[in-house]
From Swiss-Prot:
Gene name for this UniProt entry: pheS
Gene Ontology terms for molecular function: ATP binding; magnesium ion binding; phenylalanine-tRNA ligase activity; tRNA binding
Keyword Ligase recorded: yes
NCBIfam families (alphabetical): pheS (TIGR00468)
Cofactor detail note: Binds 2 magnesium ions per tetramer.
Keywords: Aminoacyl-tRNA synthetase, ATP-binding, Cytoplasm, Ligase, Magnesium, Metal-binding, Nucleotide-binding, Protein biosynthesis
Catalytically driven reaction(s): tRNA(Phe) + L-phenylalanine + ATP = L-phenylalanyl-tRNA(Phe) + AMP + diphosphate + H(+)
Compartments, record wording: Cytoplasm
Source taxon at top rank: Bacteria
UniProt name for this protein: Phenylalanine--tRNA ligase alpha subunit
Keyword Nuclease: no
EC code: 6.1.1.20
Length: 344
């Protein structure tokens, strides 16, 4: 045990520093730290020493071993850095070369319709509002004058969610975007409640909606746009004028025929289905509409004796299908690039 451990460490450091590749470094490692290496042999010989000497010599040898391992790791890192620098130098990028053009994508046809509808109504002063897709039963149905026994509230038509909100109200996936009209109107009323007269409420609410339905013309998830205009002097004539003008702009034609067919919706009174003529005497439903029911106006925080207005709701997929002559709603959700490229 008279071996100079400082000299062993110095020899190892010199040996490691002299190698130029990992294979040579592993050979030098074996000479000092391998099964028959210098330091390994010294550790094996500790068993021949008396306990007191074994303890002190073991500490010295382990310290030397730690220093050798540190030198080994330093050299490994240096070789790795040198290899990386060599690769970077060999693969240097000429930053003066022109870059690759970013491939242009395109909007989905339904999103094109979404933006087109928002632009058309925005041009005549309508705000665009967005709201939660998980709604309360009260906001989705009760606030809109849907009675408790209305079939739309059944689990056969509506996706209900386990749990309740902080006010212990049932939660569901909204079946239309009309709840956002109520939310927007209530915020509008709160904002201007200090005034004697609430400014007109003009808003559309496009978004995803959900119903338990799936076939060639229905999907469990679909897009709707709901519109609302409430003031103190809005009539059914305003509804006819606004929506007919929208259809002319959307279909880019002044030569369109529109009819308002009496119907029933719990949230409007009177109510009407809006149909549009599409050749050969065919009339196709475009939208539901009507004068906002007094109960709904009241739930918006307004006095129905002072304020009146109209509302409408249109399916964005349906508008898209009619504009482009698409017969199967499911094509929008299959992700077939051959289909989608036609609208790029």
């Amino acid at each position: 045990m008279s071996l100079d451990l400082d000299q062993v460490v110095a020899d190892a450091q010199t040996a490691f520093a002299s190698v130029e590749d990992n294979a040579s470094l592993e050979n030098e490692k074996a000479r000092f730290l391998g099964k028959s290496g210098v330091l390994t042999d010294l550790l094996k010989g500790l068993g021949k020493l008396d306990p007191q000497t074994r303890k002190s010599e073991g500490a010295r040898i382990n310290l030397a071993k730690s220093r050798v391992e540190a030198a080994l790791n330093d050299r490994r890192q240096a070789l790795a850095d040198a290899l990386m620098n060599a690769r970077l130098a060999a693969e240097a990028i000429d930053v003066t070369l022109p870059g690759r053009d970013v491939a242009e994508g395109s909007l989905h046809p339904v999103m094109n319709t979404w933006e087109r509808v928002a632009q058309i109504f925005g041009s005549i002063g309508f705000d665009v509002a967005d709201g939660p897709e998980i709604e309360t039963d009260w906001m989705n149905f009760t606030a809109l004058n849907n009675p408790d026994n209305h079939p739309a509230r059944s689990m056969q038509d509506t996706f209900y969610i386990d749990g309740r909100d902080s006010d212990d109200k049932l939660l569901l996936l909204r079946t239309h975007t009309s709840p956002m009209q109520v939310r927007y109107a209530r915020m509008h009323v709160e904002k201007y409640k200090h005034l004697d007269r609430i400014p007109p409420i003009k808003v559309i609410a496009p978004g995803r909606t959900y119903r338990v339905d799936s076939d060639a013309t229905h999907s469990p998830m679909f897009h709707q746009v709901e519109g609302l205009w409430i003031a103190d002097n809005i009539s059914f004539a305003d509804l006819k004028g606004v929506y007919t003008d929208f259809l002319r702009k959307f279909f880019e034609s002044d030569d369109i025929q529109v009819r308002f067919r009496p119907s029933y919706f719990p949230f409007t009174e009177p109510s009407a289905e809006i149909d549009m003529a599409f050749g050969n005497g065919r009339w196709l439903e475009i939208s539901g509409s009507g004068q906002v029911h007094p109960t709904v106006v009241r739930n918006m925080g307004l006095d129905p004796e002072r304020y009146i207005g109209f509302a409408f709701g249109s399916g964005l997929e349906r508008l898209t299908m009619l504009r482009y002559g698409i017969n199967d709603l499911r094509l929008f959700f299959e992700g077939d690039v051959r289909f989608l490229r036609q609208f790029a």
